[in-house]
Amino acid sequence: MSTDTHDVVEELLRRMAEGDHDRTAALFAEPVDWLLSWPAEGHPAVPWIQPRSSRAEVADHFRSLEAHHVPELNGTSVTRILVDGTHAVVLGEIVQTVRAEGTAYTSPFALHLTVEDGLITRYHIFEDSLTIARALSTQISP
């Protein structure tokens, strides 16, 4: 596997798209600097919003995402990958459908990654958390 930042980012996106959670997690260093742009307390409708630092936790994150969405209706797209040394920023749009209610949502995203020695040491994603929480909130009974 290449240690080039752009190559590692491309491989991450490929493995994520394939739904290969363990192989996706294998691209991450331990510990990983993990940040999702959500309030610290998270949201009860969005169970994957929690701290992560190990490969097992990273794999669990992607499994949880898949469990709550319809993979066949995923229309997430990447519009740009910007690389500066060990840093990369991936820009795009998340297009997902919630499995439980069939609610579709879209959100722009920016993903800041750092790659060192061929492993991802930073995973910071910024997305429209309000839109996502609203789409998943239909699963919660009042």
Across the structure, where does each feature detected by a protein language model lie?
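Alpha-helix initiation/capping motif
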Residues: 1-2, 47, 51, 102
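Short, low-complexity N-terminal intrinsically disordered segments enriched in polar/charged residues
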Residues: 1-30, 140-142
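A solvent-exposed, acidic/Ser-Thr-rich amphipathic alpha-helical stretch
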Residues: 30-83
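A beta-strand edge to alpha-helix "cap/lid" segment located at domain peripheries
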Residues: 66-142
